Amino acid sequence: MTVIIKSMETPVEIESKSLVHWKAWRDAYDDLLPAEFQETMTLERCRFFSQKYPENALIAIDGMKVVGFISYGNFRDETIQAGEIIALYVLKDYYGKGIAQKLVRAALTALNHFSEIFLWVLKDNKRAIAFYQKMVFTFDGQEKMLELGKPIKEKRIVFYSK
C-alpha cells in the first residue's frame, strides 16, 4: 500500500472525499452521538462541505481510492491568531496504517506559520484523544457544550509548533 497525501483537485476527488466524510463520520460517531443527530449528517451535507472548501483539504489516496482527508485553516475564533484542524477522517479499513498521522503532519506543515494549532474533540472520543496526544497535542482547559439532540461536551486541544 502506497498512500499519497495531496490537495483535492478534481470533481472525482471532491466526490470521493464527500463519501469518505459520510462513511467515516458514521463509524466515528455512531456510539458517541444521538441517532437523530447522526441522521442529519447526510451525503449531501458532506458534499456541501467538500465543494465549499476544497482549498482547505488534503486527501489520502491509496491507488485511485480516497481513503481519508483532513480539513484545516485559520482558527475560526477570529480573536485568536492560530491555525485549526477542522476535520480528520480515515476509512475504518485503513485505521492503524499511519494515514491519519501523515494527514496531520501535512496539515501542520501547511499551518507552520502559526505558533498554535487548535482542534476540538468530543470529550468521550477516547480514540481521537489518544491519537492526538500521541501526535503531541495537549488539552488547554477550554471546553464548550454542543446541543446535538442532547448536550455533548467538546474539549479544545492544541499543538504548539514553535
Question: Which residue ranges define each predicted feature?
Answer:
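Extreme N-terminal starter segment of soluble prokaryotic enzymes
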Residues: T2-I4
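Acetyl-CoA-dependent GNAT
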Residues: S7-I14, S18-D93, L103-A110
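Conserved beta-strand termini and adjacent loop/short-helix elements that scaffold enzyme active sites
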Residues: K6-M8, D140-Q142
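C-terminal "cap" of GNAT-fold acetyltransferases
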Residues: E116-I129, K134-M135, G141-K162
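Short coil/turn segments at alpha/beta junctions that flank glycine-rich nucleotide-binding fingerprints
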Residues: K97, H113-S115
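Short, contiguous strand/loop micro-motifs
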Residues: L33, S115-E116
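Conserved glycine-rich acetyl-CoA-binding loop
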Residues: A87-R105, L122-A130, K134
